[in-house]
């Protein structure tokens, strides 16, 4: 019986036929791979990972130091890092730049010298712009840094102790401002879009031309009767203050566009597109009136001379523009740098040579036309050239606004002159706001949006700084005291226009934008893709038909 029971147990313990407990070798390898993948991808603990994690000591067990002590240790680290390292680096660069120039020029780079004044003005303007850029208010766009640059130059000129050491000759100041004007005109010409020019209709054309022309005429009339300027100088003043500032409008519009305000009706796009054409119209009108004001002879001759300057500027700009389109050729090395150098070089040459040949109004037009025609063919590399020009502008912007501020002296200003300038500017700005409101009527905007566009078309800065001193420099080259007084009045109004309208316009845009503009709903890409996939699942035949 025991043998039979053992036989039965052995039969029960044997597996059924065709089934074995031993897995083949390749099956064991697959199991090992699966276990290794689980240990890595699914982060399941294994013996090896447990040993590794147990052997690592995390620094969380150590006592933490206060945040202030940690910041102090980082600040006093050796070698220095962070903020202290930046301060040391920038300070070394400033001292090194001065030392290099001093080693070449000698006394010119010592206090009271011309180059010393330029270097101090440059760094003070940069510092002022940085400080103003740090002033930020919630729900408001940042203050434009150009205000800090303008005030830095103004303070350097009007603080007695500093003014004795920081002196810049008029010739150097005029030349640097003219170079900055060339850079601005190149940026304006390259920024024009030929397709947008063809599509500009209706409200965009009215917004670009109407307020500028009306404000220029109003300023000319007011300055003639209130300030006693001749009609030619009145229109010079009018076109100086008639331009809107992209340096203030564009950053503010980008902030509103990111928040979705006014995007449904394209208000930010409209203002940014029309702003460029508004500036070009003001610069063109200024150059034409400048040529008429400094020409001699009869009125009919002066009118024909102004027309001749326009023709010369357009013709020279067309020739240079077509030349730069093909030279350098596309197969050359460093194509972007060569194009940027040629367009900047020809721009500076056009601005300076036009004054030399007594056609001051043709240089700006030549630069605008040249840059526009060159950019039409640079479609593939145009943005890269614009980046190089933008870097050049970053260098000359502090010089331009600092030099404009340094031209205004409190001692030479009379209270009645400032009062008349403020009155002329204020009335002209009110007329501009009303004109802008009328120009956007019958364009599909409600009353709140019309009010917003009217106030957004207020700030003035870049163009006023660029051309505000050109008339004064031209008058100084003629050596007539009366013309210099007229030029100083124009510069004073330009200075006050920047100082008053730039911060007020920026604040009004930031305050009114979120309150009066309709906010478009922002949908993420996942939501859009989800809606698209759901639509395809519901109507697959429609999507096939559309494809």
UniProtKB/Swiss-Prot annotation:
GO terms for biological process: clathrin-dependent endocytosis; flagellated sperm motility; lithium ion transport; positive regulation of osteoclast development; regulation of insulin secretion involved in cellular response to glucose stimulus; sodium ion homeostasis. It is found in: Cell membrane; Mitochondrion membrane; Endosome membrane; Lysosome membrane. It comes from the Eukaryota. It holds the Pfam family Na_H_Exchanger. It catalyses: Na(+)(in) + H(+)(out) = Na(+)(out) + H(+)(in); Li(+)(out) + H(+)(in) = Li(+)(in) + H(+)(out); Li(+)(in) + Na(+)(out) = Li(+)(out) + Na(+)(in). It is a multi-pass membrane protein. Residues 23-45, 538-547 have a biased composition (Basic and acidic residues). Widely expressed. However expression seems to be restricted to specific cell types within individual organs, e.g. osteoclasts in the bone, distal tubules of the kidney or beta-cells of Langerhans islets. In sperm specifically present in the principal piece of sperm tail (at protein level). The chain crosses the membrane at residues 87-104, 114-133, 145-161, 172-189, 201-227, 234-242, 271-290, 301-324, 340-357, 362-373, 391-411, 418-440, 462-473, 487-509. Homodimer; dimerization is essential for SLC9B2 activity. Lipids seem to play a role in the stabilization of the dimerization subdomain. Belongs to the monovalent cation:proton antiporter 1 (CPA1) transporter (TC 2.A.36) family. This is Sodium/hydrogen exchanger 9B2. The gene is Slc9b2.
């Amino acid at each position: 019986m025991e043998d039979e029971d053992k036989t039965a147990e052995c039969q029960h313990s044997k597996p059924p036929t065709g089934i074995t407990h031993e897995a083949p070798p390749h099956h064991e390898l697959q199991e090992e791979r699966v276990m290794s993948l689980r240990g890595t991808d699914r982060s399941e603990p294994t013996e090896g990972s447990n040993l590794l994690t147990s052997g690592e000591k995390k620094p969380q067990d150590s006592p933490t130091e206060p945040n202030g002590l940690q910041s102090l240790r980082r600040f006093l680290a050796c070698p220095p890092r962070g903020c202290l390292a930046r301060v040391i680096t920038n300070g070394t660069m400033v001292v090194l730049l001065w030392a290099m120039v001093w080693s070449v020029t000698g006394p010119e780079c010592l206090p009271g010298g011309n180059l010393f004044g330029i270097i101090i003005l440059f760094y003070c303007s940069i510092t002022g712009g940085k400080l103003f850029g740090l002033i930020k208010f919630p729900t408001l766009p940042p203050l434009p840094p150009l205000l800090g640059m303008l005030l830095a130059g103004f303070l350097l000129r009007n603080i007695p102790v500093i003014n004795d050491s920081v002196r810049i000759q008029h010739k150097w100041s005029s030349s640097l401002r003219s170079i900055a004007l060339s850079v601005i005109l190149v940026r304006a010409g390259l920024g024009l879009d030929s397709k947008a020019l063809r599509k500009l209709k209706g409200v965009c054309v009215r917004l670009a031309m109407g307020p500028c022309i009306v404000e220029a005429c109003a300023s000319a009339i007011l300055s003639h009767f209130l300030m006693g300027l001749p009609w030619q100088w009145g229109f010079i003043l009018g076109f100086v203050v008639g331009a809107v500032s992209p340096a203030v409008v564009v950053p503010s519009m980008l902030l509103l566009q990111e928040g979705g305000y006014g995007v449904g009706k394209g208000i930010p796009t409209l203002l940014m597109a029309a702003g460029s054409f508004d500036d070009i119209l003001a610069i063109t009108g200024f150059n034409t009136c400048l040529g008429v004001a400094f020409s001699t002879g009869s009125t009919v001759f002066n009118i024909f001379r102004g027309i001749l300057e326009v023709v010369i500027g357009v013709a020279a700009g067309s020739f240079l523009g077509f030349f730069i389109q093909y030279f350098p050729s596309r197969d050359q090395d460093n194509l972007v740098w060569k194009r940027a150098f040629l367009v900047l070089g020809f721009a500076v040459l056009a601005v300076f040579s036009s004054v030399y040949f007594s056609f001051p109004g043709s240089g700006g037009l030549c630069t605008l036309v040249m840059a526009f025609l060159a950019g039409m063919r640079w479609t593939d590399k145009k943005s890269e050239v614009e980046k190089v020009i933008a870097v050049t502008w970053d260098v000359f912007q502090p010089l331009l606004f600092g030099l404009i501020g340094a031209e205004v002296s409190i001692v030479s200003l009379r209270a009645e002159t400032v009062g008349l300038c403020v009155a002329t500017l204020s009335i002209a700005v009110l007329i501009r706001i009303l004109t802008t409101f009328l120009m956007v009527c019958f364009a599909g905007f409600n009353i709140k949006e019309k009010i917003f566009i009217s106030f957004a078309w207020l700030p003035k800065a870049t163009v006023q700084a660029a051309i505000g001193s050109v008339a004064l420099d031209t008058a100084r080259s003629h050596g007539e005291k009366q013309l210099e007084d007229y030029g100083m009045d124009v510069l004073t109004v330009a200075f006050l226009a920047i100082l008053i309208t730039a911060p007020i316009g920026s604040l009004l845009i930031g305050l009114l934008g979120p309150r009066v503009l309709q906010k478009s709903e922002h949908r993420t890409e996942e939501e859009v893709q989800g809606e698209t996939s759901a639509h395809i699942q519901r109507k697959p035949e429609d999507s096939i038909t559309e494809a």
